[in-house]
Each structure stands twice: as structure tokens, then as C-alpha cells.
A protein has these predicted regions:
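Short coil/turn segments at secondary-structure boundaries
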Residues: 143, 159-162
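Amphipathic, coiled-coil-like alpha-helical segments
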Residues: 153-157
């Protein structure tokens, strides 16, 4: 302000059920202190949260089938992650929503998230992703507790160093 500069108003971190630390721990002091919002990306963890992947089964039309995504697939499709994804399927089913919609809605339900960047390779995925906004009201505290019980990824809040 003293230099007549405009400060940042948004941060763009990765945010999904498996990548939460920055958004829910490191950046917490920024939201109210500086009024910073978040434009997050990778809400379905490169497609992992769609539930279409399983150990040794990568659909031919998926990004993980491409040579330049092999390393990401190897890092992402580990037993613990796939177990958690499978544990989320009954929750999505109970709500009558797709796994992608559940993942996107979960991100959008965070009050510090201003927008969620999604990706799609098909028109049908865009339509499905947009319907995630209708899912946000279904994410009651009880549903969020069920989700957390499966993924167990809530970060611990950083202690102040002052």
C-alpha cells in the first residue's frame, strides 16, 4: 500500500481430497488477514478421484495411458490411494452423484475457495463437472465427516512461530 502497489488477491494451489496441506494449513492466516481467495486446480487429482482407475487397470482413453503420464500414474495409483477412492464410492452412490462431482463439490464447499479449475477431454465431462455445483448443498457436516473418515487427510494446523 505504501508503494501504491496492488497486492495479490488470489492464490492458485492444487487442492483435492489428497492434497490439502497448503489450503487448510499453510494459507489459513492469509484468508482473513489479507482477504486472499483461492482458485484451485486438480479437484479430482488428475482423474484418480473419478474412480475409473484400479491397480493394473488403466483405461486406454485416459491420460494415464499416455506415455508422458506414466510417472504420474505410478505415483498416483498406489494401494492406499485406491483403497480410499473405493471407500468414497458408497458415499457418492448414497448421494446419487458421480465420484468426479463429489470431488469437485468437496473443493467448492471450502469457504476460502473462490473457484475450482476443472479439466475435461469430452463435452460430457464438462456437463458432469458443472453439475458438481448442485452437489455442494448435499455436503452436510455428517457427509463431510464420512468423507474424512475414509480419506483421513485433514492436515494439522501449523503453529505460529511468533
Amino acid at each position: 500500500n505504501r508503494l501504491d502497489l496492488v497486492g495479490p488477491i488470489v492464490e492458485q494451489p492444487e487442492y483435492n481430497l489428497f492434497s490439502r496441506h497448503k489450503v487448510e494449513s499453510e494459507f489459513v492466516p492469509l484468508y482473513n488477514t489479507y482477504g486472499i481467495g483461492l482458485t484451485t486446480w486438480s479437484p479430482i487429482a488428475s482423474g484418480v478421484l473419478t474412480g475409473k482407475y484400479s491397480k493394473g487397470n488403466i483405461p486406454a482413453e485416459s491420460r494415464f495411458a499416455l506415455d508422458n503420464y506414466k510417472n504420474l500414474a505410478n505415483r498416483s495409483l498406489v494401494d492406499d490411494t485406491l483403497r480410499k477412492v473405493n471407500g468414497l464410492k458408497p458415499i457418492a452412490s448414497e448421494l446419487g452423484v458421480s465420484m468426479a462431482q463429489l470431488g469437485i463439490a468437496w473443493c467448492a464447499s471450502n469457504p476460502n475457495v473462490s473457484s475450482v479449475i476443472t479439466g475435461a477431454t469430452k463435452e460430457s465431462q464438462i456437463v458432469e463437472n458443472m453439475k458438481a455445483l448442485e452437489v455442494v448443498p448435499l455436503l452436510t457436516p455428517e457427509v463431510l465427516e464420512k468423507i474424512e473418515a475414509v480419506v483421513q487427510s485433514k492436515p494439522k494446523r501449523l503453529e505460529s512461530y511468533r
